[in-house]
Amino acid sequence: MGRRRLLVWLCAVAALLSGAQARGTPLLARPAPPGASRYSLYTTGWRPRLRPGPHKALCAYVVHRNVTCILQEGAESYVKAEYRQCRWGPKCPGTVTYRTVLRPKYKVGYKTVTDLAWRCCPGFTGKRCPEHLTDHGAASPQLEPEPQIPSGQLDPGPRPPSYSRAAPSPHGRKGPGLFGERLERLEGDVQRLAQTYGTLSGLVASHEDPNRMTGGPRAPAVPVGFGVIPEGLVGPGDRARGPLTPPLDEILSKVTEVSNTLQTKVQLLDKVHGLALGHEAHLQRLREAPPSPLTSLALLEEYVDRRLHRLWGSLLDGFEQKLQGVQSECDLRVQEVRRQCEEGQAASRRLHQSLDGRELALRQELSQLGSQLQGLSVSGRGSCCGQLALINARMDGLERALQAVTETQRGPGAPAGDELTRLSAAMLEGGVDGLLEGLETLNGTEGGARGCCLRLDMGGWGVGGFGTMLEERVQSLEERLATLAGELSHDSASPGRSARPLVQTELAVLEQRLVSLETSCTPSTTSAILDSLVAEVKAWQSRSEALLRQVASHAALLQQLNGTVAEVQGQLAEGTGSSLQGEITLLKVNLNSVSKSLTGLSDSVSQYSDAFLAANTSLDERERKVEAEVQAIQEQVSSQGSRLQAGHRQVLNLRGELEQLKAGVAKVASGLSRCQDTAQKLQHTVGHFDQRVAQVEGACRRLGLLAAGLDSLPTEPLRPREGLWSHVDQLNRTLAQHTQDIARLRDDLLDCQAQLAEQVRPGQAN
């Protein structure tokens, strides 16, 4: 009821002030026709209490301004996404749950309100017209207190500030506002009344006195009426024309009717003014508030399209991320298989290199063993070196004996002649005879001594060098004997003379034996000994050749082992199977056993060489030991052959396991093909999802077409809302169906991952 009364009051104000246009039309005082009732805007009733003269400088203007208010327009639903983290691990994607939530919807209502503004009448300036109320550029007078409005039924109260025409909203008036079609009808009625009143006011103003229209300060105080005041001041020429002829009685009667109608509206103006003053503070706050944009159907359509586009993008991004995750996982599995194959090939290459190194080491050890055997074949003639050492020892003993003789000669008690003879005879028999016997034995083994002494570290010197050394030492002995004889002759003349012939005879005997020794050291005397040595060397060579043949058989077996390893390496290179670490470990163990056996063989060979070097006392014992060692070597070679046969059987087993690995690789390939089929099914599902998204877009287009008819919401508010809620329910059902499809796709993806894991696990175990 309050709103209806407000509308009636606004209609009355509009009818009263309908002559005002957009910029405002002033209402000036004018003389009333004879016989008409007098009425003033500044007094209430028909008998004004105060003189209206001081108030005629102010005129009431009709101004239009916009009023905004916030209204609640039902509720709207929006989709809220809730993200939940997966509990299975960081690689598992989270789940998204979409919920429909209702929230209130508001709109901003606009209303153009017609109001009264008190301003200076055109052409009035001075102390009775304040500066802030002046319309034209007149001289600014000193400000005085505003004139008091006469009290009565219509109390204007504090005069509101002047308002200019409100600028139109950038969005325009969107559809019916707060009061709907009733307000539009009232505005149409007000506009028609304004046109009618403007026509009548023009007819009345054409008969008015120009002097009174100017409203100068010298004009007499007359009752205030209605009229249209032209822009600016009235010229003096118009004043001189005088009053015009009065119009017809019909015009005056119409003016009287309008005045009576205005009198009936005064009471309504009182109530409207009171309500306006009561709502002034609220209106001021609304005027100061910035206008907010209107929520139109275009904005709603744009919002719905943006949300659907974001939802579609998020769903497509989720599918793309899942497909990329599946593809990356398949790529990682393929890279892992490739890496395992490369590791197997690298392990086979390292095994081949280690076998080559072991083969070279075995060959070097066999060559060293052959050289040691060749050295042992000649070591039987090492007694010559011992005989040379014995000769050197005897020479040293001879020198010591001479030194003792010299010291005894230099002593205070010189021995007698018979003692000298005994000493010289003992020396010659004990030292020189032994030396000559050693030389004879040395001549018998000259050929062996030459071969042995060539390997001595002190230098290579033969029989000739040894003979020169002996001659030098014999000469030194002769010189020492000569000096000894001189000393003896100097000390005792008679004993020396008796002993000199004995010494000379001893020396002559010594020279004869040396000459016989030189004559006996000829090649003809050593031929028999050399023949025996050559026969012995040939026997040793035959034995070493037999040992070399055994070593050659060993090398052939090693070459066969290398060929088998090469075949295994070729099979490893051709196969595309997974890990071969267990088989390679077994092969390494076998090779380690072979290397250990070869190491034992080398140790036994070193022991044999030590035994050969230690068995220099007897050739028979050496021969027996060599035969025993050769027999042991043969036994080890036979045992090694059995081990090689076992290794061959293990290689055959490895071939069978390689075939099994190939079968496992074929199974993995079939699993990958099934994974590809699953990926194709996922792509088909994504295509079906695109079709569903297209259906959702079609539904959104239909929703937009339905939203285009929302302008008729005030008249038909139920059917569009029901259709909108039905489309919202359809959108919710579509989202629920999409959620189920996403869950189904996730389950299919997890099943595919589980199948791949089950297929890869047996290959890793093999």
Curated annotation (Swiss-Prot):
It is found in: Secreted, Extracellular space, Extracellular matrix. The keyword Amino-acid biosynthesis does not apply. Keywords: Coiled coil, Disulfide bond, Extracellular matrix, Glycoprotein, Secreted, Signal. Residues 132-179 are annotated as: Disordered. Disulfide bonds join C59-C121, C86-C92, C120-C129. Residues 1-22 form the signal peptide. Transmembrane segments: none annotated. Residues 467-491, 615-663, 726-761 form a coiled coil. One of its GO terms (cellular component) is cytoplasm. It holds the Pfam family EMI. GO terms for molecular function: extracellular matrix constituent conferring elasticity; identical protein binding. Residues 55-131 form the EMI domain. InterPro entries: Collagen/C1q_domain, EMI_domain. Glycans are attached at N66, N443, N562, N616, N732. PANTHER family: EMILIN ELASTIN MICROFIBRIL INTERFACE-LOCATED PROTEIN ELASTIN MICROFIBRIL INTERFACER (PTHR15427), EMILIN-3 (PTHR15427:SF2). This is EMILIN-3. It comes from Homo sapiens.
